A protein has these predicted regions:
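Outer-membrane beta-barrel transmembrane domain signature of Gram-negative proteins
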Residues: 428-544, 592-595, 762-768, 809-811, ...
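Short, acidic, small-residue-rich periplasmic hinge/interaction motif at the N-terminus
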Residues: 29-49, 71-75, 87-129
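Gram-negative outer-membrane beta-barrel transporters
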Residues: 538-540, 656, 677-809
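N-terminal periplasmic accessory domains that precede
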Residues: 87-96, 136-139, 157-160, 191, ...
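Outer-membrane beta-barrel signature, preferentially recognizing the C-terminal barrel domain
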Residues: 584-660, 679-689, 694-722, 771-774
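Extracytoplasmic beta-strand/coil segments of soluble accessory domains associated
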Residues: 137, 141-221
Length: 910
């Protein structure tokens, strides 16, 4: 089946025109009292000239010498001229259909992401629908520095802020890995209704003892696409968060309040509410993905409400083969109770996420990944406000946020091996023994079975105080507790699941079964914090606000003091902002408890077909856990300027973030006493052996340590234009420029074995190679909004201005060496080029520049949404509407560029 792009675009244009033509009108009725007469009129907008609207508990009115105009689409303008001391009263008539009215029909509805007081960005109302959103990750693509990603729901999605380390949100373009991206993604905290959603207990990996802390596990690629399930150490998989019941999303890329901890990159706050709402059915379709959603809100009583939602999503990377797929089932129940001083919000959630891989009939050795995750969570937000509020309400309220989550995670990896019978290590202690053999051909399988459990608790008290000089203080004191564990069966699999030996003398890192329940200890985090939000309004109408906080964390016995300050000074239309703060992120269970490290060496392999196969293996066991890991830390600094023009508000923010003690890999030299064996062979009997002595054998093993550093600095611009009433047009613009430099700590040196054997040097020591990434992106949004017609036609542009990745040349001269006794010797700087060390000189690698280089790329995306009074709502989404081609300066396809694709969403409110 082939589609003609011209016909498709023509059809979309026709559909857009049809939606415009099908518009219907709406205005609110009000009773207007003027000069002793009352009149019922329709009001959509009120335009006063010479006075402002006054409101109190009883009425709304205009007073004084002025002109007031009431407008409604399709109605004549009502104009009232008031003289001195005359008054015009307005009483809005209760709209019986208000509950059924869509937000799209409200003129003031938020259409774009908005900056709040400091550098927080809020997305709510129609802004949540700017992009076709199957999950929270899609919603966040409209933030500054982000972009519309190539569509693919078979790979895990997470996000990083204000960094040039890899792609912003993972997509089919690439799977960012490495310490740079990994530390930033791991440092993002996601909270739903002020309860942390944790991935710290995820241990779904199969070689954490030997691999990088941010190595990818259980992922595979074939001709139908790439399947990558949720990964340990990378933060929460945003695919698991549907948007059905989200009320608003707030993103803090800068300095968070002292209440929030266990983060280094940023904070995402998702808010959901329980309210009465009609039954709504949603259906979405895009490429190989479809989604069904059902929501309903009930008003149980005047004080109580209950919201229920159900969501199902099925995604196939390539519908022609169905070899790679992802399914999500989510149910949510939210109950709220609000009465006078007492508020309570109780939430329950169940979700099942499965990643399904199928065997490619044309790839006999292809790898298949299957994942089945089920999770349960229960959270409660409770708040009690004390009576007698005054200027000095020392204890105005007390609140508690409590969450418990439990998940069952099962991951399977399997592929066919046909390499002949090979010996593999099985011992779990230091030993020389007869090794087992794999079958000549067999299906190799590896499993990870996890049962992560998490508790989150935050208890705080709030109060306020106004001094005699009118300084307002709104303060809070709180304690925070986190508990994490994993009760799963752990890692296990078939024979030779990780490493086998093909010839005598072969050696390598082995793998053994590792039970989480028996070996993993729970992690705990305690925190105490205090925050004072200070506000002062001066006589000249200038406003000063400062949020000052201090947090003390005890994370797995490591303590951190985190001062945090956000402040702004407003002078009319001009505001200057600034902030500085320290945050920290505790290591995950998967980084702390890796299991022992096994080093296997094949000493002998003797086979007599039909009689025996005898492999002599030596195993050396090294303790593998990293209980001495400390939290990573990040100093965050920013300064900003805001200015309100008559036509727009401009926000400029400069930031400088320094990550310290990030998680990375360090090579550790080891020495073993390699056994010398004497083998006795007698006829057809199984050979016997005896150990006659030992000799030293050196090797390297990896270990996770604190030692990664990076610096992110850049500028961020957001512009919110005032609605152009004559065109019904809302314009938004954002842009960002970021430079990221990264390197391992000076104490973590690169260790390499010399190419030429030297009796004096076992290994050479070299400085780590520096890397610098630079990214600049911009985005425009144009939303044509007819609220009375329930119509939005939106265009969003993505501009890839700079995308450069620069890797400097390697350090060819050693800074030190390790001798055969594993003694580390440092070389003075003046002697590094001495010919004595010529066998340690490395081959020079050239500087490398990759990315777009000097080319820029631009993309355009379309959204058309129409709301019908009958209850139907239809949205059409087109990515890369002009079918632009994404080639970089070298003529290669730029993988971050979204190709043309079509999607639609239809919903019905009963």
């Amino acid at each position: 089946l082939s589609l003609n792009l011209y016909d498709v675009n023509k059809s979309l244009l026709s559909a857009s025109m049809l939606l415009v033509a099908a518009s219907s009108l709406y205005a609110q009725k009000a009773k207007v009292e003027y000069r002793g007469q009352a009149k019922i009129i329709d009001i959509a907008t009120i335009t006063p000239t010479g006075c402002i609207m006054n409101m109190n508990d009883k009425e709304t009115f205009f007073e004084g010498k002025c002109v007031v105009e009431f407008k409604a689409i399709g109605r004549p303008t009502e104009r009232f001229v008031l003289k001195e001391k005359e008054r015009l009263n307005i009483t809005f008539i209760k709209d019986e259909n208000k509950k059924q009215r869509s937000e799209i029909r409200i003129e003031e509805v938020q259409l774009t992401a908005k900056k709040k007081q400091f550098s927080e960005i809020e997305i709510k109302q129609e802004a949540l629908q700017n992009l076709q959103s199957f999950s929270l990750g899609d919603v966040l693509q409209q933030l500054p520095g982000q972009y519309v990603q190539p569509f693919d729901n078979t790979q895990f999605k997470n996000i990083v802020f204000r960094t040039a380390s890899g792609a912003s949100i993972t997509g089919s373009s690439q799977i960012p890995g490495g310490d740079g991206y990994g530390n930033k993604a791991f440092g993002v905290q996601l909270m739903i209704n002020d309860v942390a959603l944790s991935n710290n207990e995820n241990m779904q990996s199969y070689d954490s003892a030997n691999s990088s802390p941010f190595g990818l596990s259980f992922n595979t690629s074939n001709r139908s696409g790439t399947l990558t399930p949720a990964q340990a150490n990378y933060g929460v998989d945003l695919r698991e968060i549907p948007t059905e019941n989200i009320e608003s999303v707030e993103v803090i890329q800068g300095i968070p309040d002292a209440k929030y901890g266990d983060l280094t990159s940023g904070l995402i706050k998702v808010n959901t509410i329980a309210k009465e709402s009609p039954l709504r059915l949603d259906a979405s379709l895009r490429e190989g993905t479809y989604q069904l959603g059902l929501t309903k809100g009930f008003r149980l009583s005047k004080e109580q409400a209950l919201s229920l939602s159900f969501d199902y999503m099925n995604s196939i990377s390539d519908p022609r083969t169905s070899l790679v797929g992802y399914d999500r089932i989510t149910t949510n129940a939210l109950w709220s109770y609000n009465k006078s001083r007492f508020r309570n919000k109780l939430s329950f959630s169940f979700s099942q996420n499965t990643s399904n891989g199928k065997k490619d009939p044309d790839d006999l050795d292809g790898m298949v990944i299957n994942v089945n995750n089920k999770s349960f969570s229960l959270s409660n937000n409770i708040r009690y406000s004390f009576g007698g509020a005054s200027k000095r309400s020392w204890f105005r309220s007390i609140s508690a946020d409590i969450g418990v989550s439990y998940a069952s995670q099962f991951t399977e990896r399997k592929y066919w091996l046909n390499q002949g019978a090979r010996p593999y290590g099985t011992s779990t202690e230091n030993d020389v023994y007869y090794a087992s053999y794999t079958p000549p051909s067999y299906e190799n399988t590896a499993y990870a079975d996890g049962k992560p459990f998490n508790i989150y608790t935050n208890i705080s008290t709030e109060g306020n105080y106004i001094s005699k000089s009118k300084w307002s203080h709104s303060y809070s004191l709180g304690i925070n507790y986190r508990y994490g564990d994993n009760f799963g069966k752990g890692r296990y699999g078939t024979a030779g699941q990780f490493a086998t030996m093909s010839s005598v003398g072969d050696s390598g890192s082995g793998m053994r079964d590792y039970n989480y329940r028996d070996n993993v200890l729970a992690t705990t985090q305690y925190a105490f914090y205090m925050q004072d939000n200070i506000t002062k309004r001066f006589a000249n109408k200038h406003v000063l606000r400062a949020n000052v906080g201090l947090r003390y964390d005890i994370q797995n016995s490591a303590s951190t003091f985190s001062p945090r300050v956000n402040t702004y000074y407003q002078m009319g239309k001009f505001t200057i902002r600034g902030g500085v703060g320290l945050t920290s992120k505790a290591p995950s269970l998967n980084q702390l408890y890796t299991g022992p490290r096994y080093f296997d060496m094949l000493l002998g392999d003797y086979r007599l077909p039909g009689y025996y196969s005898a492999a002599i293996m030596q195993t050396v066991v090294t303790p593998g856990d990293n209980s001495d890991l400390n939290p990573s830390r990040s100093w965050k600094t920013e300064i900003g300027l805001d200015y309100r023009f008559s036509f727009a508000t401009i926000n400029i923010t400069g930031y400088y973030n320094k990550l310290l003690d990030g998680f990375t890999t360090m090579a550790i030299p080891r020495v073993m006493d390699k056994a010398k064996v004497n083998v006795n062979i007698t006829g057809t009997e199984i050979p016997t052996f005896e150990i006659t002595g030992t000799e030293k054998f050196n090797y390297l093993q990896n270990r996770i340590v604190n030692g990664y550093e990076s610096t992110d600095k850049g500028l961020e611009l957001m512009t919110s234009f005032k609605r152009i009433e004559s065109l019904n047009l809302v314009i938004g613009f954002n842009a960002s420029y970021t430079e990221t430099e990264s390197i391992k700590d000076a104490s973590i040196l690169t260790i390499e074995k010399p190419k030429i054997i030297d009796n004096n040097f076992q290994y050479g020591l070299y400085n780590d190679t520096k890397a610098k990434n630079t990214v600049a992106r911009a985005s425009f949004s144009f939303d044509y909004h007819l609220p009375a017609s329930g119509l939005i036609v939106g265009l969003r542009t993505d501009h890839f201005l700079i995308d450069k990745s620069f890797t400097s040349e390697n350090d060819i001269y050693p800074v030190g060496y390790i001798d055969y006794n594993l003694n580390r010797v440092m070389i003075p700087d003046a002697n590094r080029k001495d010919q004595l060390y010529q066998n340690l000189f490395r081959k020079r690698t050239e500087e490398k520049l990759s990315g777009l280089k000097n080319k820029t790329l631009h993309n355009v995306h379309l959204r058309v949404t129409k709301d019908f009074l009958s209850g139907f709502r239809l949205s059409v989404y087109v990515s890369n509407v002009f079918n632009l081609k994404p080639y970089n300066e070298d003529g290669y396809v730029y993988s971050n560029f979204t190709t043309t694709s079509f999607g639609a969403n239809i919903s019905y409110r009963f």
